[in-house]
Amino acid sequence: MVLSLQTLAKKVLAGQRPTKCHPHFLKCYGLWWHNGPMIFDQNQKKIWSPIFTDGVHINAALVKAAAENNYDLIKLFTEWGANIDYSLLSVNTERTRDLCRELGAKEQLKQEEVLYYFNTIKRNLTSSNIILCHEVFSHNPILETINRTKLRGIIYEQLEALMENTDILSELLTKYWYGIAIEFNLTKAIHYFYQRYVHLHQWRLMYALFYNNVCDLHELYAKEKIRMDMDEMLKWACRKNYNYLTIYYCCIVLGADINQAMFHSIQFYNIGNMFFCIDLGANAIEEGKTLALQKDKSFIASLLSINCYSMNDSLSLKETDPEVIKRMLKDYHSKNMSIAHKYYIKHGFNDI
């Protein structure tokens, strides 16, 4: 497409730092959005505005402009290279739909196209983008028209054990975006969800435990005073293998029973967690072996039959700062797992 002189001028002006441009000129050129200057980086194809402080891809910005029925920006973003078909994800009036058709949009998106655009937009893992995705998609009727099984599959990949058996799509999607914010520690987005969804405070605590996010766990438990039964917390920490950070925090910082953490790990068949608990001082080995046999987990019972496990004395049991805990356990390899592995290589487990 050949750009007009006016469009080129806007493109150049949008690439300048806002301090170099008088607000009057930005407003005249339509580069004032959300009560502040709008910036465009043509190399990254990203837009910044007061609500998009981390920047969003121009296609995502187009989705927002269409949702707001901002005709000037729909035209401008399309001229700057946005795919006009993305506007169909959020168009909500006939007048806006007619404009998008004039600019080349399809009559409607196919199911696979909706899912493709959905997956493409969410890839930009910034607070600005995840908040935008939540606002655009969590109550969007266009998602009601696509294959529910496929969409639930996408959500399950993120939530796993925290996926609820509900048909209320908006609830699932809210937790989906919230979960992404927690997993990738998107602090502005986390604060956004925390302020708006008070009923999800305990769910966020469960998510932090399950996804080994010790910083968020500390934030919720020590600072926000969010509470739940300690044994339930242990279960969520032990449910996913190699959750060393949240197991350490629960047992060493909060004082949860390390043997109980080992038992939960055995029940979930998470061998990495089990050995880490032994590293931390779990010593109810015979009880653990009995539990493994009761739960028909013979391989774990065989592992626990080796009589040479002990606490890892080199592992500090005094840390309470989540950042220090993260650094300490970043590349941690279990001492007792190494012992079991060497035994297996040398003897096998057939004779145990």
Swiss-Prot record:
Pfam families per record: ASFV_360
Subcellular localization(s) per the UniProt record: Host cytoplasm
UniProt GO cellular component terms: host cell cytoplasm
Inducers of expression: Expressed in the early phase of the viral replicative cycle.
Sorted UniProt keywords: Early protein, Host cytoplasm
InterPro entries: ASFV_MGF360
Superkingdom in the source lineage: Viruses
A Gene Ontology biological process term: taxis
Subunit structure: Interacts with host STAT1; this interaction mediates STAT1 degradation through apoptosis. Interacts with host STAT2; this interaction mediates STAT2 degradation through the proteasome.
Protein purpose: Plays a role in virus cell tropism, and may be required for efficient virus replication in macrophages. In addition, inhibits IFN-beta-induced IFN-stimulated genes (ISGs) transcription. Mechanistically, degrades host STAT1 and STAT2 through apoptosis and ubiquitin-proteasome pathways respectively.
Homology family: Belongs to the asfivirus MGF 360 family.
Protein name, entry field: Protein MGF 360-9L
Organism: African swine fever virus (isolate Tick/South Africa/Pretoriuskop Pr4/1996) (ASFV)
Higher taxonomy: Viruses, Varidnaviria, Bamfordvirae, Nucleocytoviricota, Pokkesviricetes
